[in-house]
């Protein structure tokens, strides 16, 4: 769910039943916090890939008259081929004023295709907007998942990716990212993608829930201004300024 001024917007999702069957939804549901009105919009997509799931979407308030929604990653519902994960070389942009989706090409150090990652963003003092993409996985558990313990930032309006420089060690998926103070993003929970102790297809996913979280209390802080992890939360934080790598991108173009 994302906030659009006085509106809350929920795109896609699932409906299910007691048998465990799920059906993907294609509509955009908007709730107006002022009028208490709920609107179900059917909006045409931007490609023929079909329905997408397990990706991330964030509201960007400082572009367009009503802001924009930026959607990325995840996989394609109903597909089992190796290429069902959606690459980050393109993102989908929704214009709520005109109720239209667009597809936007990106450049830079792109994340590996993944799903069940977390996403959060912040407007900088330089009139850009940076979106953090952290963790997630490609559907496989075990040591092959270690590279997914990585953080990438997409800067807008340049639509340019920058990768944070640290050593991957603790991959996770099914977590959340939350902007909690200017440049600080709070990472909450998730399950251990590294664990795959069972050869049984069903039991192997249970292993991911069995290990202690290396983050104290299941919480961690990522600093967007420095593109690095912080040891603690700072209650009084300076206004968010984009990281030097991002400022360099704009200054050299």
What residues fall within each predicted segment?
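Beta-propeller blade signature
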Residues: 16-36, 82-100, 145-160, 201-228
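Extended hydrophobic-aromatic, low-complexity segments
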Residues: 129-131, 141-148, 161-163, 196-197
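A structural motif specific to WD40 beta-propellers
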Residues: 39-41, 102-104, 162-164, 230
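Conserved short beta-strand element of beta-propeller blades
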Residues: 1-10, 18-31, 41-76, 85, ...
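Short Gly/Pro-enriched loop/turn and capping motifs at secondary-structure junctions
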Residues: 138-140, 161, 167-172, 182-185, ...
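Juxtamembrane/interface segments of multi-pass membrane proteins
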Residues: 47-48, 79-84, 103, 107-110, ...
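Short glycine/acidic-enriched loop and turn motifs that connect beta-strands
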Residues: 6-15, 64, 76-80, 126-127, ...
């Amino acid at each position: 769910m994302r906030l659009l001024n006085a509106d809350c917007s929920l795109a896609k999702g699932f409906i299910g039943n007691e048998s465990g069957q799920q059906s993907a939804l294609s509509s955009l549901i908007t709730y107006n916090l002022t009028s208490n009105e709920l609107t179900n919009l059917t909006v045409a997509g931007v490609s023929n890939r079909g329905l997408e799931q397990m990706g991330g979407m964030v509201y960007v308030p400082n572009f367009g008259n009503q802001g924009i929604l930026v959607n990325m990653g995840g996989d394609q519902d109903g597909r089992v081929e190796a290429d069902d994960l959606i690459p980050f070389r393109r993102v989908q942009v929704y214009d709520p004023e005109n109720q239209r989706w667009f597809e936007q090409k990106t450049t830079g150090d792109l994340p590996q295709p993944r799903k069940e990652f977390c996403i959060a963003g912040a407007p900088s003092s330089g009139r850009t907007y940076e979106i953090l993409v952290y963790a997630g996985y490609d559907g496989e558990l075990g040591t092959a998942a270690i590279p997914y313990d990585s953080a990438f930032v997409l800067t807008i309006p340049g639509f340019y990716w920058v990768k944070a420089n640290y050593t991957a060690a603790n991959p996770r998926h099914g977590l959340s990212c939350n902007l909690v103070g200017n440049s600080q993003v709070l990472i909450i929970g998730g399950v251990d993608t590294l664990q795959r102790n069972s050869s049984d297809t069903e039991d192997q996913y249970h292993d991911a829930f069995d290990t202690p979280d290396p983050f104290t209390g299941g919480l961690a802080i990522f600093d967007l201004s420095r593109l690095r992890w912080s040891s603690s939360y700072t209650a009084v934080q300076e206004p968010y300024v984009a990281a030097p790598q991002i400022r360099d991108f704009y200054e050299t173009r």
